[in-house]
């Protein structure tokens, strides 16, 4: 498993935001990908990404730890936006 890989967990797409440095751990930190429509977008905190031909927002404020075995197979990878996603984690945890 690697940072920015996408999985489907219980019908929800999630992106792995955990550094690969901790790849041997039994858990991974993930954030859900949501359609912008029903979810509020906060500047800096909910970066937009393209995946599977659609535009999503990464809901960093919904971070969760998931057992790696519960993630299942990778269904893809987010190719851009890494810096924006990690900056959003900083905003959530440090306030800037």
Model-predicted segments: where are they?
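Compact nucleic-acid interaction/catalytic patches
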Residues: 3-10, 15-47
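C-terminal terminal-subdomain/extension
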Residues: 51-96
